[in-house]
C-alpha cells in the first residue's frame, strides 16, 4: 500500500465528514492539515473532531500545540475546570513571572507541520493503513505535497528581541524598520500582516538575508514516491455560507464554547499571533466583556467566517490539481452522486 488521500476545501464544506466515511471504508487514519485545529486549548471554536469521532477513527495532529507563548498547562491544567472556579484558580497564578521563566521557542511553523505529518504518514503506511490528510490550510497542504523552502532556525534570543520591538512600536513603525533592513519584503508583505512581518524581521536579523532569497531554491516533495490522491471539495457558495452560519450559531449557543473562551480570556495577551486568528475568538471575548450581545457576536463572527470561506473557495478553485474536484449544490448531492461515483462504483 502506497496511497495517500488528501481532502481539501474551504471551511464547513464537509471535509471531516467525508474523511470519516473514507476512513471507515478503507481502513484509514485521519491526519490534520488545518492550522487552527492544531491548538489544544480551543478545540470547540475550531470545530475540531469530537471525542466520539476520535474514538471511532485514529486522528493525528489535532489539538496538541499550545496557543500560548509558553506551555501554560505546566502551571495549571485547562481540563476539568468548572466555570465557577476559573477566575479564582487563575488569579492565584503569577502568570507574567511564570511565562517569562518558562518561555520556550515552541512557536509552530509550516516546516514543523510537514516534519510531523510525514513521520505519521510513514508510520501509517507501514501499518498497512490509509493516511487521509484533511484540512483547509492551503499553505500546509502545498508544503506537504510540493515541498517547502528551508530557512535556518531562528534562535530564541532573536525571537524575543523581535517580539519586544514589535510591542514597542506601531505596526507602521515596525514595517518601516523591516523595509529598511529588507527592502525586498516591501513587494510581498503588507503592513497589516503582523505574522509575516515578524517572521521576515526574524530571518533578516538572524541570517542577514531576506526571507525571500530562500525562495529561489528548488522544491522537493516530501511525498515523492507515494501515490497521492487529492480530493478538493467545492460546494455552491450559498450552501457554503449556509453551512458556515449554521455551524457557528450551533457552536456559540453551546455553553461549552463560552466556557472554553472564559478559560483563555485572562491570558489573551500571551496567546500567539497565529492562534488569535481563530475565527470567533475575538467576538466571544467581546461578548464576555459586555461589549456585544451574544446575537451581535454571532452575526459578526459569521460574517468573518463567510469572508474567509469565500477566500478559500477562490483559492482552491484556482489550484491545478492531479485528482478529483467535487462540485455540489447540497450535501446530499455530494454523497449520493459525487462521492459514490468516485469511491464506491
Curated annotation (Swiss-Prot):
Quick one: a GO biological-process term for this protein?
A: tRNA modification
Entry keyword set: ATP-binding, Magnesium, Nucleotide-binding, Transferase, tRNA processing
Q: Please list where the region (Interaction with substrate tRNA) is annotated.
A: 34-37, 195-199
Q: Which domain of life is it from?
A: Bacteria
InterPro entries membership:
Dimethylallyltransferase, IPT, P-loop_NTPase
Tell me which EC number(s) this protein carries: 2.5.1.75
Q: Which residues cross the membrane?
A: none
- Enzyme class comes to transferase
Where is substrate bound in this sequence? Answer: 11-16
Which reaction is catalysed here? adenosine(37) in tRNA + dimethylallyl diphosphate = N(6)-dimethylallyladenosine(37) in tRNA + diphosphate
Could you say which cofactors this protein requires?
Mg(2+)
Write down the position(s) of the site called Interaction with substrate tRNA.
Answer: 137, 159
Query: Per UniProt, what is one GO molecular function of this protein?
Result: tRNA dimethylallyltransferase activity
Q: Which residues bind ATP?
A: 9-16
What is the protein's known function?
Answer: Catalyzes the transfer of a dimethylallyl group onto the adenine at position 37 in tRNAs that read codons beginning with uridine, leading to the formation of N6-(dimethylallyl)adenosine (i(6)A).
State the oligomer form and interacting partners.
Monomer.
- Name the protein family: Belongs to the IPP transferase family.
The name this protein carries in UniProt is tRNA dimethylallyltransferase
Lineage here is: Bacteria, Pseudomonadati, Pseudomonadota, Alphaproteobacteria, Rickettsiales
What gene does this protein come from? miaA
Amino acid at each position: 500500500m502506497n496511497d495517500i488521500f488528501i481532502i481539501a476545501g474551504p471551511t464547513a464544506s464537509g471535509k471531516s465528514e467525508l474523511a470519516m466515511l473514507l476512513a471507515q471504508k478503507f481502513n484509514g487514519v485521519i491526519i490534520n492539515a488545518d492550522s487552527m485545529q492544531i491548538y489544544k486549548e480551543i478545540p470547540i471554536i475550531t470545530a475540531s473532531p469530537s471525542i466520539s469521532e476520535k474514538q471511532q477513527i485514529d486522528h493525528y495532529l489535532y489539538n496538541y500545540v499550545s496557543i500560548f507563548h509558553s506551555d501554560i498547562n505546566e502551571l495549571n491544567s485547562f481540563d476539568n475546570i468548572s466555570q465557577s472556579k476559573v477566575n479564582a484558580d487563575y488569579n492565584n497564578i503569577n502568570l507574567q513571572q511564570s511565562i517569562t521563566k518558562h518561555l520556550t521557542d515552541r512557536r509552530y511553523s509550516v516546516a514543523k507541520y510537514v516534519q510531523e505529518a510525514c513521520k505519521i504518514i510513514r508510520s501509517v503506511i507501514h501499518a498497512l493503513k490509509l493516511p487521509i490528510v484533511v484540512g483547509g490550510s492551503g499553505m500546509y497542504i502545498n508544503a506537504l505535497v510540493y515541498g517547502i523552502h528551508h530557512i535556518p532556525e531562528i534562535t530564541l534570543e532573536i525571537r524575543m528581541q523581535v517580539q519586544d520591538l514589535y510591542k514597542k512600536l506601531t505596526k507602521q513603525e515596525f514595517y518601516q524598520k523591516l523595509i529598511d533592513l529588507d527592502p525586498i519584503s516591501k513587494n510581498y508583505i503588507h503592513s497589516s500582516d503582523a505574522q509575516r512581518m515578524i517572521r521576515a524581521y526574524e530571518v533578516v536579523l538572524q541570517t542577514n538575508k531576506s526571507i525571500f532569497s530562500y525562495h529561489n531554491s528548488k522544491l522537493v516533495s516530501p511525498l515523492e514516491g507515494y501515490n497521492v490522491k487529492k480530493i478538493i471539495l467545492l460546494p455552491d457558495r450559498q450552501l457554503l455560507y449556509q453551512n458556515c452560519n449554521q455551524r457557528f450559531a450551533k457552536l456559540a449557543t453551546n455553553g461549552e464554547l463560552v466556557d472554553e473562551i472564559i478559560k483563555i480570556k485572562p491570558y489573551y495577551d500571551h496567546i500567539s499571533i497565529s492562534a488569535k486568528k481563530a475565527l470567533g475568538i475575538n467576538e466571544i471575548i467581546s461578548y464576555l466583556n459586555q461589549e456585544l450581545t451574544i446575537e451581535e457576536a454571532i452575526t459578526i463572527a459569521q460574517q468573518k467566517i463567510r469572508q474567509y470561506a469565500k477566500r478559500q473557495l477562490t483559492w482552491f478553485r484556482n489550484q491545478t490539481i492531479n485528482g478529483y474536484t467535487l462540485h455540489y449544490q447540497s450535501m446530499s448531492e455530494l454523497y449520493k452522486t459525487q462521492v459514490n461515483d468516485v469511491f464506491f462504483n
